Regions:
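Short hydrophobic beta-strand element within catalytic cores of glycosyltransferases
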Residues: 289-292
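Nucleotide-activated donor-binding/catalytic signature segment of Leloir-type glycosyltransferases, i.e.
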Residues: 235-252
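Conserved acidic donor-binding segment of nucleotide-sugar-dependent glycosyltransferases
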Residues: 304, 308-316, 325-330
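Conserved donor-binding/catalytic core segment of Leloir-type glycosyltransferases
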Residues: 4-6, 188-204, 210-213
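Short alpha-helical donor nucleotide-sugar binding micro-motif in glycosyltransferases
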Residues: 259-264
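Short His-centered aromatic/hydrophobic patch
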Residues: 84-90
Length: 365
């Protein structure tokens, strides 16, 4: 089995999708699948080693994509599948490459591709064509599968949850010491740290949660940690609510965030819509209770056994979840965290993720 893997998200590009792509590719390679990654990018990247080809899109992506086919065509018969992973240009080009090469197309649909792509005048036709041209579609949230099936009824859709390697995702003693020192300097005694981590854009519900903390009268119980890129206007909102103690940290590499996680008593993901964010798995794997909506794949991971869940977009339910979290004692939080870590180990490991993709690939050869 040999895959032509077309993506816009691959290291050294930053972000959760690049991390996910790298993890899935590595898992398949470890299972004996040959994967040739085609990284479509507008960034100036140095040439990579064997198995990764960078295709600079530049100012003329149409030319770059067509030119790539010229170099691909003579050896296209060595592949068994074409895979489209995340982003508009992979969803645009991979169906064409698959059709011209006479190969099955597997589309690995990520949250952003579908959730907002379906309501974009520019992207909707691209996404729909890719779904309908696919021999199989994989989604990271169980609730997304029927939505895809309604739009592409003849295409098989499979839920394959994101995974995490818990053996390598651990906080070092030195990181815990730094986190404790940071808390001693920045967090008032008696306050719990509530972290929101990643690209904190509109869909992540950041303001929904902050408003729930303030409106519920719990601003004095929490210190908010905002680690990542903030949505526009959030700085002004925070300035207008001086009762809310917070620290804003810049976007950081995944492993740099281990120190941030170590400083958090809870991690919040109050998304309006989502896939299955890596942050949720990372926090749960470290034994940190999660305060989250039931958007997308968060519903597959989070329940009251491991955290505080509420219906996505419901401000009253969000306020109630914040209230429950504020009143939980240390023993309750520790029990929730331990249950979350156990759930991730049992249900969301990399081996399960890889097996899911291997099953789909084998069924479409």
């Amino acid at each position: 089995m040999r895959l032509l893997w077309v993506t816009e998200n691959y290291p050294p590009s930053p972000g959760g999708m690049a991390n996910s792509c790298d993890r899935i590719v590595h898992g398949l390679q470890q299972a004996g699948v040959a994967v040739d990654v085609v990284h479509l990018t507008r960034r100036d990247l140095a040439p990579r080693g064997a198995g990764v080809r960078t295709v600079p899109l530049g100012d003329d992506p149409e030319h770059a994509l067509r030119q790539f086919w010229t170099t691909l065509a003579p050896g296209a018969d060595r592949y068994t599948h074409v895979v489209a992973f995340g982003g508009t240009y992979p969803l645009l080009s991979a169906p064409v490459y698959a059709a011209w090469a006479g190969l099955p197309l597997i589309t690995l649909l990520r949250g952003n591709d579908f959730d907002t792509g379906m309501f974009s005048l520019r992207r909707q036709p691209v996404v729909l064509e890719a779904l309908r041209a696919s021999a199989a579609v994989c989604v990271v949230a169980a609730s997304t599968a029927p939505l895809v099936a309604a739009l592409a009824p003849s295409t098989p859709v499979t839920w394959v949850a994101n995974g995490i390697d818990t053996t390598e995702w651990q906080v070092l003693p030195s990181e815990r010491q730094k986190a404790a020192a940071w808390r001693a300097e920045h967090v008032a005694p008696g306050r719990r740290t509530l972290g929101m981590i990643g690209q904190l854009k509109n869909k992540k519900g950041v303001r929904l949660l902050l408003e729930a903390v303030v409106a519920g009268g719990h601003a004095s119980r929490f210190h908010i940690v905002l680690a990542g890129e903030l949505e526009p206007g959030l700085d002004e909102w925070l300035a207008g609510h001086p009762s809310l103690a917070y620290t804003a940290l810049p976007f950081q590499d995944r492993y740099q965030l281990l120190g941030v996680y170590a400083a958090c008593d809870l991690v919040a993901l109050p998304s309006f819509y989502d896939g299955l964010p890596n942050v949720a798995l990372e926090a749960a794997a470290l034994g940190i209770p999660i305060l989250a909506s039931d958007a997308g794949g968060l519903a597959d991971l989070v329940d009251d056994t491991i955290g505080f869940r509420f219906p996505a977009g419901d401000p009253h339910a969000c306020r109630a979840a914040v209230h429950r979290a504020a009143l939980a004692d240390d023993d309750q939080l520790a029990a929730l965290g331990a249950a979350g870590a156990a759930r991730v180990r049992e249900r969301f490991g990399v081996a399960s993720e890889t097996d899911g993709y291997l099953t789909v690939l084998a069924a479409t050869r």
